[in-house]
Amino acid sequence: MNAKEFLIELLKFKSVTPNDDGALNFIAMELSDFEAFFIEKEGIKNLLLTKKFKDEGEHLAFGGHVDVVPAGEGWSSDAFVPMEKEGFIYARGAQDMKSGVAAFVDAVKNADFKGARLSLILTSDEEGEAIYGTKAVLEWMQERDMLPDYAVVAEPTCVKKIGDSIKIGRRGSINGKLLIRGKQGHAAYPEKCINPVHDFAPVLKLLAGFDLDPGSAEFSPSKIVITDIRGGMGVCNVTPNDLKLMFNVRNSPDTSLEDVKSYVEKICHGLNYELELKQSSEAFLTNIDNKIVQKMNESVQKITHEVPELNTKGGTSDARYFAKYGVKVVEFGVCNDRIHAIDERVSIEEFEKLCLVFKDLIENF
């Protein structure tokens, strides 16, 4: 089947995370000349497809996920019955990221690769916990001395049109929980209470929106973003016993969890508080002079006639795991204007260009 037909079939699988619903088997059958390793961890199904072309040379990998977020209500048609209309294919996962998977499957089928090994790393655990998927496959590969030299993760990276953006890194993510303790009492007798809202009010303006670093050419500043704040009993005559606050920092490599901890401790000095911090993902950056960045840039410009912005914007992805294992990685895919949305769709023209970009990359790597 051709690339579009393959994408349409792939979109029919109700692979709501972490269930692959048979999508991984379907892909393995399409690439029957590749060695297939089904790697399961904690009930999560992953697939490594790999093919050796020669003994010496470079190992290039493509990474992606077949799991999708739930469809939800309000769709114009069944989210798992792909609908083609006016140059678009509508279905859950059309942009995020079955189009990317279908594109690199088509590319490896049709490209003439001159390197040593091609691999496809696929998971059904990216939209959820994302800890037993790509990470587990890379761990398995490391144990067998099979790690790739370079990787492309086919997440939807483009903003307005195919070719306008390549991700060369990602910010990390640090989650924080702050508990300010007080003493509950009657609002008519504030002198007998310890009101954590009053105590914390001057500190809030030092926390909310604060830039922990100035940013760089590649990364925006590591900003503290308040995501939740609550206290009290929902009544007007009782002061709260404590105040609970949650925040997130999308951090660059210039700001660590320890930096966040140090700043919060400094501004909360004198308060009775508890602080909990967790790094859910780490920042990474692939140098713009690296081969994978240069070759991807060349292929994108050649096929799309766009000059892509090389950036680190957006949330986290499985590319961070490749970077952690020392693999030089970039991300490139279709536009992301409808990801996780009702009536998610992908442009057929964009998808076909993506297939050609990946094919060109493989052949000229």
Swiss-Prot record:
Cofactor(s) listed: Zn(2+); Co(2+)
EC number: 3.5.1.18
Active site (record annotation): D67, E126
Cited Pfam families: M20_dimer, Peptidase_M20
Biological process, per Gene Ontology: diaminopimelate biosynthetic process; L-arginine biosynthetic process; lysine biosynthetic process via diaminopimelate
Co-factor: note: Binds 2 Zn(2+) or Co(2+) ions per subunit.
Pathway: Amino-acid biosynthesis; L-lysine biosynthesis via DAP pathway; LL-2,6-diaminopimelate from (S)-tetrahydrodipicolinate (succinylase route): step 3/3
Alphabetic keyword roster: Amino-acid biosynthesis, Cobalt, Diaminopimelate biosynthesis, Hydrolase, Lysine biosynthesis, Metal-binding, Zinc
Database matches in CDD domains: M20_DapE_proteobac
GO molecular function: acetylornithine deacetylase activity; metal ion binding; succinyl-diaminopimelate desuccinylase activity
Enzymatic class: hydrolase
Binding positions for Zn(2+) 2 per the UniProt entry: D96, E127, H340
Residues reported in the UniProt entry to bind Zn(2+) 1: H65, D96, E155
Similarity-based family: Belongs to the peptidase M20A family. DapE subfamily.
UniProt-listed PANTHER family: ACETYLORNITHINE DEACETYLASE, N-ACETYL-L-CITRULLINE DEACETYLASE
Subunit annotation: Homodimer.
Record's function text: Catalyzes the hydrolysis of N-succinyl-L,L-diaminopimelic acid (SDAP), forming succinate and LL-2,6-diaminopimelate (DAP), an intermediate involved in the bacterial biosynthesis of lysine and meso-diaminopimelic acid, an essential component of bacterial cell walls.
Protein name: Succinyl-diaminopimelate desuccinylase
Encoding gene per record: dapE
